[in-house]
């Protein structure tokens, strides 16, 4: 072969080499292989206690790869279970789990009516499971996919209370000794200090005889409690109080005004969601920080309060607002307007919802505080990788995805019990028998 033939052969081969190389590079740069959702499983359990927990397991076409999400709703449990099994499951199977945003949007629109709590619970379970899958595929915790850690641990506030001021002081000091810097204090239960005892007071003939809530009595009782705590414990502990939406407009304004000298970290749910306009009145008269959002399920409940800076903390529950995808967007909105997060994770909340909040909180500069939840030992056994609270901080496992799993066999041994009164939330009443908003 002469020089000219050699050159011709070489030149002719160049495109072939380039194409082969390009194909090899393209194959290597495609990343992970495509996935589909192969099956969807609904898991329910009482958590070995009084809980009514609902979880979703999204199983992919890759052997051993699945995600877990929470659909927790203690009060309409079976409605959520039916929505997951009968409506979401057949719609979700066969879809691409990598398309989290598209699946969230289309899952919301598939019901036509949207933003209700049951539908949001369904969205949340799917969304958390998809983020769990995404993190496991990337071999990264979800918080790394959200931008990485913005802090080393997530501070949580402790729950305390007592029947008297002295009992409340003892409880506060116990929390501080255990490393908590933020403590929520209640005088008895929700509305405590504002109840007329059973059968006492002027009541309608043949009417309601149970403990009766009185707004003015409550407004008179709570400020002296926190004045006492500040006098005895000083201004070091960051104090929180939950009104639990028991007050109407001007009584809420008056309580906020009276609590200003106590320098509260915040007052929680001082107004019911039907009377949010009164937050403007509170802002105009005092600087007592306000937190709200526990029962919110629609973004338009949140946006006006945040953009007008009428509140200081947003207290949405991740599982009630649709999951990690929408709550991360809400957190970004709050950051722009200087509002902080205080996600609601106590009470009947579950470990998966708690750890989903953790991933958002640890990666956000809008974070303020997270509510604690102490689970019994059986729950720690049932949920490998459960979050751990130590000295006032919540820590995740650091494993890929959400970093938490569920022991399905143990969950099955602790099934949901009978539903009392249809799962209804308890109702407080006034002395004349009228319903008090929770």
PLM feature segments, named:
Residues 3-24:
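N-terminal export signals
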Residues 18-49, 66:
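C-terminal segment of N-terminal export signals and the immediately downstream linker at the start
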Residues 37, 64, 88, 126, ...:
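Conserved, mostly hydrophobic/aromatic
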Residues 54-62, 387:
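Short beta-strand elements
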Residues 61-62, 66-137, 435:
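Metal- or metallocofactor-binding catalytic centers and their adjacent structured scaffolds
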Residues 86, 102, 257-266, 272-401:
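Shared catalytic-loop signature of beta/alpha-barrel
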Residues 153-280:
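Metal-dependent enolase-superfamily TIM-barrel catalytic cores that perform enediolate-based chemistry
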Residues 402-438:
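Extended hydrophobic packing segments that form well-structured cores
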């Amino acid at each position: 072969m002469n020089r000219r033939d050699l050159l011709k052969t070489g030149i002719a081969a160049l495109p072939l080499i380039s194409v082969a190389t390009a194909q090899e590079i393209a194959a290597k740069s495609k990343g992970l292989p495509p996935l589909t959702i192969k099956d969807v499983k609904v898991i329910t359990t009482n958590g070995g206690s009084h809980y009514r927990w609902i979880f979703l397991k999204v199983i992919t076409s890759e052997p051993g790869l699945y995600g877990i999400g929470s659909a927790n709703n203690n009060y309409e449990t079976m409605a959520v279970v039916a929505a997951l099994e009968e409506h979401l499951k057949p719609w979700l199977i066969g879809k691409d789990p990598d398309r989290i945003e598209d699946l969230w949007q289309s899952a919301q629109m598939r019901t036509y009516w949207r933003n209700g709590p049951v539908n949001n619970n369904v969205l949340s379970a799917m969304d958390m499971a998809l983020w769990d899958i995404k993190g496991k595929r990337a071999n990264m915790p979800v918080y790394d996919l959200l931008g990485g850690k913005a802090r080393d641990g997530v501070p949580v506030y402790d729950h305390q209370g007592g029947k008297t001021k002295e009992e409340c002081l003892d409880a506060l000091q116990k929390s501080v000794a255990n490393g908590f810097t933020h403590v929520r204090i209640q005088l008895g239960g929700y509305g405590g200090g504002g109840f007329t005892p059973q059968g006492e007071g002027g009541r309608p003939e043949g009417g309601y005889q149970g403990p009766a809530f009185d707004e003015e009595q409550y407004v008179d009782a709570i400020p002296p409690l926190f004045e006492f705590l500040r006098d005895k414990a000083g201004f070091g502990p960051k104090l929180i109080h939950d009104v639990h939406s028991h007050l109407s407009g001007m009584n809420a304004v008056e309580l906020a005004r009276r609590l200003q000298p106590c320098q509260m970290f915040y007052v929680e749910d001082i107004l019911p969601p039907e009377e949010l306009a009164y937050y403007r009145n509170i802002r105009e008269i005092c600087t007592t920080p306000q937190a709200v959002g526990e029962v919110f399920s629609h973004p338009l409940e949140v946006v006006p309060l945040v953009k007008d800076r009428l509140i200081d903390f947003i207290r949405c529950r991740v599982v009630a607002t649709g999951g990690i995808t929408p709550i991360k967007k809400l957190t970004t909105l709050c950051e722009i307007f200087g509002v902080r997060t205080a996600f609601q994770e106590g009470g009947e909340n579950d470990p998966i919802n708690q750890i989903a909040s953790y991933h958002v909180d640890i990666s956000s500069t809008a974070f303020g505080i997270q509510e604690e939840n102490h689970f019994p030992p059986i729950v720690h056994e049932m949920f490998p990788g459960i979050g751990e609270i130590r000295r006032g901080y919540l820590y995740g496992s650091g494993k890929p995805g959400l970093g938490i799993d569920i022991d399905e066999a143990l969950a099955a041994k602790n099934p949901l019990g009978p539903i009392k009164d249809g799962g209804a939330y308890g109702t407080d009443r006034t002395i004349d028998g009228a319903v008090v908003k929770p």
